[in-house]
C-alpha cells in the first residue's frame, strides 16, 4: 500500500488503517442495533456516554431519507427540536448492511 501523503518521494510514513469494525449492541428506545459507526477512533464506551449524557448530540435522533452517497443519515436533535449536530458524525448503517 502507498502512503496517502501527496509527496513524490517514497514516504517512510506509515499507512494508517482503521481497525476492523466491531459489532456494537446499543438499544435506543427499541429503535434497533448499531452495527457500524464510521468513526473507528472513538471508544464504544465513550459513544454510549455521549448518547446518554452529552446534550450537544441531542436527546432524540432523526433518521433522514437516503441520498446517493449516504443511504441512512442520523442527526441529533436537542430538546427544543433544533438540529444540533451529527450524532457521532454520520452513522451509515444501511451501507454497511447492504455491502455484506
UniProtKB/Swiss-Prot annotation:
D-glyceraldehyde 3-phosphate binds at residue 89. Pathway: Carbohydrate degradation; glycolysis; pyruvate from D-glyceraldehyde 3-phosphate: step 1/5. GO terms for molecular function: glyceraldehyde-3-phosphate dehydrogenase (NAD+) (phosphorylating) activity; NAD binding. Homotetramer. GO terms for biological process: glycolytic process. Its EC number is 1.2.1.12. May play an important role in regulating the switch between different pathways for energy production during spermiogenesis and in the spermatozoon. Required for sperm motility and male fertility. Belongs to the glyceraldehyde-3-phosphate dehydrogenase family. GO terms for cellular component: cytosol. It is found in: Cytoplasm. This is Glyceraldehyde-3-phosphate dehydrogenase, testis-specific. It comes from the Eukaryota. NAD(+) binds at residues 39, 64. It catalyses: D-glyceraldehyde 3-phosphate + phosphate + NAD(+) = (2R)-3-phospho-glyceroyl phosphate + NADH + H(+). Keywords: Cytoplasm, Glycolysis, NAD, Oxidoreductase.
Amino acid at each position: 500500500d502507498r502512503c496517502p501523503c501527496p509527496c513524490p518521494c517514497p514516504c517512510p510514513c506509515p499507512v494508517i488503517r482503521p481497525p476492523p469494525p466491531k459489532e456494537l449492541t446499543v438499544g435506543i428506545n427499541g429503535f434497533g442495533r448499531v452495527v457500524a459507526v464510521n468513526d473507528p477512533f472513538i471508544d464504544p464506551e465513550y459513544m454510549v456516554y455521549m448518547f446518554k449524557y452529552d446534550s450537544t448530540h441531542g436527546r432524540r435522533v432523526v433518521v433522514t431519507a437516503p441520498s446517493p452517497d449516504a443511504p441512512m443519515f442520523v442527526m441529533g436533535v436537542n430538546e427544543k427540536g433544533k438540529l444540533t449536530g451529527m450524532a457521532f458524525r454520520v452513522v451509515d448503517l444501511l451501507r454497511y448492511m447492504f455491502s455484506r
